[in-house]
Structures are given as C-alpha cells and as structure tokens.
C-alpha cells in the first residue's frame, strides 16, 4: 500500500486554475522531487497536502486513510484540519522560527502543545533531533545568532519533532547563499538514508537527480512528466520538460 495517493486534485484561485487534476503515488521511504518554473503549481500542491489550502476536487489518501475529499466539506473543522496536518511536516522557504525562543524551545514547542508526551521525553527527542541536524552546540542559541543554513536545519528538526508520515520541503535552499545550501542538502540526504519519506520542491537540479527516487516536472498546473531521475533528466519525453531542463542547464 502506498503511503500517499493523490487523485484528481484540482485547485483554483478565482478564474485561475493552478492544479488541474493532479494524480500520483508515493511509497514509504521514497523521495519525490518536484521541479518546474514558477507558477507551475508546485507550492500550491504542497499547501493542499498540508491543508493550508483546500482543493475543489480530488482526494488525498495517507496510509490507506482518505484525509481529504473535495466532495466532503464536513471534515474541515479546525480540529480535523489540525489532525490532518500531523501527517505532513512542512519546511518553508523562509525559516519561520520564533525569534523569542531558543533552538530547543522552537523544536519542543509543538510537541508540548500537543500534550501527548512527558516533558522529559519531549526534551530527549528534541536533543536527538538537534544532534541529527548537526546543531548540538547551538541548542540554547536564539535564531538571530544562527546563519540562514543553521536556521533552516532547525526548521527541519522542528518539522521532524511531530513525527510526520511525509516531510515536505518548499524550496528549502532558495533563501540561502550558495555556501550555505550544501549544509541543508546534506541534512536532507541524511534523512533519505534513514528512509524518511519526502517531497521536495527544488530548483537544485543536481540534488533532484542524485537524491530522488522519483522526479515530477510540473507546468501550468499539470504533471507534464514523472519518472525516475534517469528517465526525466536523461530521456525526457515532453517538449516542455526538454525546454525547462535546457534552460536550467544554461544557468
């Protein structure tokens, strides 16, 4: 059984349809990279998966449970939405850390609010996550004392603290200087080695090619092409994919 199944996802903003019947599946432990030009629907897809936006049509199924059905508006109460979001962790382009909290406090905040674990257990797991992203020596620092790359790694640890089924990244390196990009991509590569299921919207073609199990190219609200990195990057079938990759290679 697939960990994620998306069927017929359609989303519009006014007269502009930004997702036009999106269909795909993801297996546990797979990494899916989503590439494409701005305005293709990539970020909107992530926002729909995370219940930050609601599609008009389609279904989202996680581990066999339908967590979203465009035809059923009865399950959009705040409590239901919060529960749906637990399936997905989302790391944004901007780090969105709470500036008044330390690294440890940022990572432990959501689990403490959930109230399902003891304080000791939350602290222990947070320290393990902070170590996992290579920031043990910064655990008591505040965001203003960290580099952009370090802040993004804290954001990754914070997302992992909720134990999501699927970890989503929306252009995780786009706000970083080139020299800081590598440290964030290294963390994501480490997560892959631990069989973390991930969806990564990225403009880093080398990363998408080397780390992904699947690559999705989106254009104008549709999946123009999807397959293994070898198939998409070396033998693209769509003319739009070919044009996008040719342009990306020139940059």
Regions found by a protein language model. Give the residues of each.
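Helix-to-loop junction immediately C-terminal to a conserved catalytic motif
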Residues: 50
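Short coil-to-helix segment of the ABC ATPase nucleotide-binding domain corresponding to the Q-loop/switch region
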Residues: 101-109
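Conserved ABC ATPase signature
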Residues: 142-146, 150
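A short, proline-enriched helix->beta-strand linker immediately N-terminal to the Walker B motif
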Residues: 161-165
